[in-house]
């Protein structure tokens, strides 16, 4: 067995953990916090030109005020379809059509809804932690295979410590992101 077979690809492990963090940030971005953000519209697709098209590909999305999102739809014939897609999306915002522009006034969240969103954020964070732990498990499995292929005990310990350090760092980043998101959600 060659020396390369006994190496553990820490970069691949790091990339997979970073992917879990990116997915978490995307999920957090879709949570409506009472503050305007273009990211709340990312999951919305519009039936345009015979296919489901992401809303951000049909017009420009701006946030001119803290509680207002403005969509300038490029094809004026799509305004009613965009409005319907927003209404049907379940994000809890009623679009207001103002000529060629669609305005989305973001209502304030009540305390009960804030707590509910905080729990949803915690659920997303737990999913990210599970994904990171699964990556850790895969890394540890690589180390076990390398050990059975002749890796020295000291090398096994070193690689295990490296994988654990990456895991601890990624879990800490998830916890920090969750804390920040919950603070943002609970802020009145």
UniProtKB/Swiss-Prot annotation:
Alphabetical keyword list: Cytoplasm, Protein biosynthesis
CDD domains from the UniProt entry: RRF
Keyword Transmembrane helix included in the entry's annotation: no
A GO molecular-function descriptor: ribosomal large subunit binding
GO BP annotations, alphabetical order: cytoplasmic translational termination
Subcellular location: Cytoplasm
Classification via InterPro entries: Ribosome_recyc_fac (IPR002661), Ribosome_recyc_fac_dom (IPR023584), RRF_sf (IPR036191)
GO cellular component: cytosol
HAMAP family found in the cross-reference section: RRF
Protein purpose: Responsible for the release of ribosomes from messenger RNA at the termination of protein biosynthesis. May increase the efficiency of translation by recycling ribosomes from one round of translation to another.
Similarity remark: Belongs to the RRF family.
Protein name (record): Ribosome-recycling factor
Gene name of this polypeptide: frr
